[in-house]
Amino acid sequence: LSYDGNSGRADATGNVVITQADKTMTGAKGWYNTKTQEANLDGGVSMIGSDMAMSAQTVHSYNNNKFTANGSVHLQRADRQIFGDSVEYSTDSEYGLVTGNARLIAEGTTLTGDKVEGWMKEVRAVAQGNVTFSNPERNVSGSADRASYTRTPN
């Protein structure tokens, strides 16, 4: 572990644990900047928060409310899940952009594509490229180049 008081950056290797607000991130190596509230972890990263969980190969976190994750990313929040090669996500807006093997699961519907944008607060998503969708409970499935999914009002 090393710390530079001028820059506010701490670097660590071996079972690194970083706690930011309600989130705890673990990984093989990483750094955290106390001045910018920016963190980076690499090597089997997991992040657990009060209402979410995520795993990835690498995670870069900004200001306690936004992150980018790469490498077999899996994010779960309530009954909604996101999978992909790369994920950018804002916990404030609950907006996510998933690229590469993108998959979104929400309310019994699975939506896949090369790229999926999701607005989790709204239960709304747009998928592009090699899109598939299915909801076995409603006996519906399909495929397209582009698809939009929104929750039906009650």
List where the protein language model places each region:
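Structural signature for solvent-exposed beta-strand/loop edge elements and short helix-capping sites
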Residues: 1-154
